[in-house]
Amino acid sequence: NAYKNVTVYGVNDNLTDGNQTFSVIIEGDNQTLDSKYNSLDVDDIFVVNVDDDTPGFTITPISGPTSEDGGTATFTFKVNTVPDDLDSSTNNDNVTINISSSDITEGTVYPSQLVFTKSNWNSENQITVTGVDDNVSDGNQSYSIILDVDNSTTAVGYSILNPSDVNLYNVDSDSPGYYVSSVSGDTDEMA
């Protein structure tokens, strides 16, 4: 008459799929020595696996400023959960991120788009920002790398998110002044 404990462990699926109910099926053993327990029908137990996955983004800090002499800065970007539109009849489970510079006269960005799928969702993607020389002595100039979720994104939770932009500055390499060249030859007061 002793109770036996059965422990059920939840499994993390990295999907934003809400709490999932499943059943633990208990069946009698047809091979037991006590015939009263052969093929005994025991009620199944229903269990809820609580979803702990929240859609979002992980962005590492920028490595530093860019510079007008072509100096670069980098950061990485990834999604936090497996992209899934929860519709098994489609194959449109991507999260697409568009990347652009707020001021292309100060810095450009590569790549201009990232696409996260079920197979690469957990990969950190490096984004490189390259400084541009504007040939103006304007001091260090602030600008941003703009990150936007593309309208084609259908993965649960991602289409409504807006990742944080990355702010940085471009170090000025231009200095004010003028250049005087020497004149060849002599001048004449009579001219």
Mark where each language-model region is:
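Short boundary segments that mark the start of a structured unit
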Residues: N1-A191
